[in-house]
Amino acid sequence: MNAVIQYILYLAVLIALAIPLGAYIKKVMNGEKTFLSKILTPCENAVYKVMRVNKDEQMNWKKYAVSVLIFSGIGFVFLFLLQLLQGVLPGNTQGLAGVKWDLAFNTAASFITNTNWQAYSGESTLSYLTQALGLTVQNFVSAATGIAVLFALIRGFIKVKADGLGSFWVDMTRIVIHILIPLNLVISLCLIGGGVIQNFKSAETVSLVEPIAVSAEGEIIENAEIDLEKNIVTVNGETVEDAEIVTEQFVPMGPAASQVAIKQTGTNGGGYMGVNSAHPLENPNGFTNLIEMISILLIPAALCFTFGKAVKNKKQGVAIFMAMFICLALALGSIAVSEQLATPQLAQDGMVDISTVEQAGGNMEGKESRFGIASSSTWAAFTTAASSGSVNSMHDSYTPLGGMVTMLLMQLGEVIFGGVGCGLYGMLAFAILTVFIAGLMVGRTPEFLGKKIEPYEMKWSVLVCLATPIAILVGSGIAAAVPSVADNLNNTGAHGFSEMLYAFSSCGANNGSAFAGFNANTVFLNIILGLVMLFARFLPIIGTLAIAGSLAGKKRIATSAGTLSTTNGMFVFLLILIVLIIGALSFFPALALGPLAEFFSNVM
């Protein structure tokens, strides 16, 4: 019962914060006054003046798309070079060398696409300058890019017989200055108050409370008896040769809180530490865990209400929100039950306690004892529903069904809230597909929000909906055919295949989380995963802007008795059905070879 209350609390807090934020974002989109305008509008106007931006410019969809691509391309080149040259640049207190070209390519592609896939550990690979000037900046602008494209699509629904969708540069400026900076400033201060580190100190070394012994391979020796004076390690009276006694701990420092905040709110997901928000210095307690977890879905959920207010049809925004929310709740319930019940092998003979949600119960492998099953499962559902990818537990250690649900949430196209901006414009593409199919069934010309849906919009909508499945399946298919990829798997068989499929699902969905048993830092994998991320990010953006441009040029059709309602429960059901059918048809064969095969091998 305590677990149920905990899950309900998380969801209730999310909704309570999303509604007012959605109203605020709508005002920012339209350039209306907000309670922060007196402070922030002068900053906004200063940016326009310095950058010589015409705030009244109206770009057509092609110019808007070119602006997005040029801006992202410049960010890619800058971040790529910053990593290569970090060894000779300042802000490198640990003296770290430049990053290899293939890893630099992968990381640059990852962060400009809002994926934040990390084939490295940040605290031991990247300097403070690279983290702050490279990654954190991209965390802001990649998130803003997704929201800007959504703004353009919303204007496509609003405008009548128009060509312009607004200015990309104005949208980016307003989003960063009025939304992302204020929100993340507040969250950063809360995280610092909760114990997340924020400094520019060099890494420190501290003494352990008691020494530990490790083997020559670096593995901890269990039941070891340590004699510090003689430097001898024994187990059951026998001396362990080549054993090393460890008495000190390396503690990374740095500006973590500021990066963690935008990592969460921008659905970026790339952690300051290698183990992300499972690290006690990045997420030390329940208070910081709650803030970070709610932050994942805060903007994606708020944008649903922004959409409803902007198109002057609040019920439409609520309908889209409910479709996402129902899918999220079902996924959360599935993960929570799977992790609490563990596997038949763990549950047999009372091997683990599965009767409560206390920290020792259920499948606790890969989870932090300070969070337990409930907080870990909720985070797993939130981070894969959004295109975040941040973690507070290791998804590779989840049960087969629990891991499959996290994978499926990404494979659906990251439209169950999804990334900031991109999740909603992806779901709206599914909504267009839904009204078209429904129109065919009843013999009516499909229309959505007063705009007629014709073959042009359908072609682009299908492309937006299928970009993620194509990227994932083609990429993982190529990788599966390369023998050397199998050497990078910590496991064989069904779980090994799941590790590889999860990696490509994560990159294809611009998520960034991973089954940690997959070593992705090779030249081949860095390049192919980078290409998958770029394809899955920018093809839907181009498709969305093409749809927006077409819709803006159409006249508005009056609602009639034959118009399909897109705000009732039936439409919500149809929308969910279309999303699930496309996901199931696309990925069921692959899931059958991975997590489903692993599940049935455990129960039989």
Q: Which sequence ranges carry the predicted segments?
A:
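P-loop potassium selectivity filter motif centered on the GYG triad
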Residues: 90-134, 198-294, 348-422, 486-535, ...
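C-terminal catalytic subdomain
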Residues: 429-433, 438-442, 459-485, 489, ...
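Alpha-helical transmembrane segments and their helix-start/interface "positive-inside/aromatic belt" motifs
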Residues: 7, 56-74, 167-185, 311-328, ...
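Long hydrophobic segments that form regular secondary structure
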Residues: 287-318, 325, 387-459, 535-536
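Alpha-helical transmembrane segments
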Residues: 164, 305-311, 440-455, 486, ...
